[in-house]
Amino acid sequence: MNDKTVTINSNSNTDNKKNKTWQPVRNGKTFIKYLGLNKKISEKDKENLIEDSVNLIGQTINPENIENTVLNSTGLCFGQIQSGKTTSMEAISALAHDNKFKIIILLTGNVTPLASQNTSRVDRALQGREWHVIKNLPRVPWNKSENVNKLKNVINSSLSENKVIAETFNKTVLILSMKNPSKIRRITELFNEVSSWNNSIYDKVPTIIIDDEADHHSLNSQSSKNQADDKDEDELYRVEINETWETIAEKFEKSVRDLKEINPEIPEDQELNPGDLINTEHKDIRTHAAIRDLRTVFNFHSFLGYTATPNANLLTNTLNFLSPNFSQILEPGSDYTGLEFFFCQQKYIDRYISPIEEKIRELEDSNERPKSLEDAFMHFVVSVACGYITGHSNEGNRSMFIHPDRVLESHDQYIKWINAIKMKWEGELKTDKNTEEYKDIIDCIKKSLEGIRDNADEKDEIPEFSETFIQHFKESLTRIIPTKFNAGRGGRIPEIEWDRDYAHLLVGGQGLDRGFTVEGITVSYLSRSVGTRQQDTILQRARFFGYHKKQKNFIKIFLTDELSDFFRDTYHSDRELRMSLKRHSENPENNLKDWPRVWISRNIGNYKLTRPGINNMWGVVSRNLPPPPAREGFAWKMRSIDI
């Protein structure tokens, strides 16, 4: 067996207290109503959604057992790329309301399209008088006085000793917010104003904070810069006689927990000695700091971090307030097409994956249009024409995305190429039918259609080649207009109006990196290089994952050989990670902080698990790195073994 293992063992004596599990009410009115309105989910998938939601809520704080949890209730919700994590957030919110949670805060999307997409879905799904909705989003006016009143109403009724009042006016505040520092600080300021800075009033108000894409922006990417060994002596604090963790923390207005986190080289149970040099300044990113400030408002809350790529969350220092102590593996629906669907066997790779030229960078640099791009676009236009003929255009979308690079100039280059291909084909289709140009383009269209038919499971979905098909191809070609899906220079990433047109072609970089759903994705062209070779970052570019089985006959994914190998290998490592976490969580007494940090992969030496700044011990973990020198009392160990 060629698999490799990277193991990181935590030997630190962290506070491994875990909330006791409890049995939530699963047949409450709001949850039942939500499930009933969700017509797109099959009964079998609803059963899985119910079980996942109940198990997850049952690991959070128990609203009927009020206690001071501070920052000790942090969950990892591990789904798959485009597998319905937003649906889980909706279900969790509905279930939380029925179980007497009074405040739910959803942090989602650091770019406008993603924030708008996800919050609008949640807003539509959670309609009803049981909600006071506060929107903290771009292009949505912030009515401070109205929001203060909404929050006060819920707080006052929930704290009322009159049970009739509390039950009659049973509302939950649902805050839908973009995840950026200023927006998060605005929420914190709102709660501070309502409490007149006496946040103890929230001690009896059960709260859930949901973090969408929890591995992105939320974590402290400056963590590795908190090493005392990497600083000059004048940047550190020298411990004086009789000083302790507690007295120094009080002196610098920090918690003992925070002080120990930024001094990871000192074992947590070790006392300080006079003359020791320690960190007192915490380097972190603004979003991370804003989330910490928001969480400290609530002594009685749970934090749920959703992600499909949890390497960074699992590698962050277990003393950090975002290090999870429980987890829930979210099962995808039966129509999901992801790593397993496309990459578990060679026959599926052969069917759905097409190669991009090995020298794609050289072609781009010389402005030479790649043949694979023409093949991809031909497949897309033929698929769109099929949709118009069969009537699929009346009920959904057919889309294509091109992701060449984060650099804006590359997006311009590919749009010019697509427009040039369009112009060339339109011209050839207008020539006399006896010309070689016309015969060549017709032959290409026919071969593409026959290729789709040959691979299709349902042949009747594929129309016959005919003059009618040629006319639909011409019209489809005209209607497809490529969209530059980036913010330009100082602008915004455009919001796509999926209902306005059937066919969409997006060319972008960052906007297509994570979270964003490309409706009706049919053809994907991912030519971007692996860059810094971070496994989680590359996996997030798989916008072709999702619920696409209904149009599997038309799906085609164009990848470089390197990316194709990456996704094939990642299928195995992702499966191993899920199985390991699932086994660990089967025992309700197990704390996720104690889970052995083990990653198994066939090709783990070629990729980094996550970005360097997250792991403040040795940074990025890779089999290619030499073992670090042994240090007495050090909190972490790393080794690489063959199995």
Predicted feature descriptions by range:
Residues 231-255, 276, 281:
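Primarily a LysM-type cell-wall glycan-binding module
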Residues 135-137, 205-211, 220-231, 282-390, ...:
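Conserved P-loop NTPase catalytic core
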Residues 488-565:
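Conserved RecA-like P-loop NTPase helicase motor core
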Residues 131-145, 206-209, 214, 224-226, ...:
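Conserved C-terminal RecA-like helicase domain
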Residues 102-138, 179-182, 406:
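Conserved Walker A/P-loop ATP-binding site and its immediately adjacent core
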Residues 353-442, 446-459, 545-548, 561-643:
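C-terminal helicase lobe and adjacent C-terminal extensions/tails of nucleic-acid helicase motors
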Residues 88, 92:
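Hydrophobic positions on the alpha1 helix immediately C-terminal to the Walker A/P-loop
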Residues 146-210, 218-231, 282-294, 508-509:
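Conserved RecA-like ASCE ATPase "motif II neighborhood" in helicase/translocase motors
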